[in-house]
Each structure stands twice: as structure tokens, then as C-alpha cells.
Amino acid sequence: MFLKNGYMKDYFSIVYETLHVDGSRGELENALKISKEDLKKRNVIIIDIANDKIPSNDYKPEEDPKLYHSEKTGRGPLTDPDWKNKVEPVMTCYKLVYIEFKWFGIQGKVESFLAKTVHTLFTKFHRQLFCWTDKWYGMTLEEIRNLEAKTKQDLDAKRNEGEIVANNLEDL
């Protein structure tokens, strides 16, 4: 995914890549095969959907992996502090995010703010994904594609109405 801002043109961009690896517990050193130069600069952030703090105004008990239990899969709640090393099945979602904001004097602050925002966004999204398991588990590929098409249609409609403001997946 590549995001740009029309006003800032080439002075602002966010690029992110994602790779899901079944059976991985986060041990792959370079899952997305980035260059040695980028490896030296990267900052690895581990997201723990059960134990990472989220802003209190975003907290919903029904989206808390420490409280959620899937009726369909039997997964959850994630109450063991070491759940990441014990649960089965397991998958790691490796994400690589490049943030570039070229504006003298505030570049570092804006990039740092955006990195924290992206971390919060990914944490909230993956908490929701886990806690909504019973809504999507067992869907066929055709049902998923239909849901994607409906979501795209709804987003396009909102985009045509004006600015999209979303704090979580339910807002979209």
C-alpha cells in the first residue's frame, strides 16, 4: 500500500507491506526481504494484541482479546502473559512501514507521531480481527470477496460524500 498527500506531493509518503506466515511466532529476521541498508535502519516493534495498551477512549470489552472467546473455534481468551508462545494454531503478520515526511524543522516529530499512530492502528485492527473471529470464520472465498466488494462500495460512497473519518473498522 502506498499513500501520498496531494498537498505535500513528493514530500510525504507512507508505504507499507504485509506478509502473513503460518506457524511463525515472529522469529523470521527478514521476512519481507528488505535490503541490508534498510535492515540497519529498521526499528522492530512487536505488537501484542492481548497485552499492549490502547487509548482508553478506544477500549471496548467486546474487542479485548483477554476477554473474548470464539464459539466457532474455541480460541481465546488470551489470558496467559506468554500466550504468543503457547497458542495453536499461530500466524505472524509481518509489516514493514516506510514513513517519509520531508519538511525541515518538524520532520522527526511528524515521522515519530505517524509511527506511533500506525502502531496504535495496527494494534486496534488486529485486536478487532481476533475478537470478530465468529463473524468471519468459515466464510467461503466468494463470501469474503462479496464482503470486500460491499466494503469498497460503502467506502467509495463515503468518499464521494466528503472526508472519511475513521477511528476503527466499524466506522468504515
Tell where the protein language model's regions lie, with residue ranges.
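Eukaryotic helix-grip
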Residues: 1-172
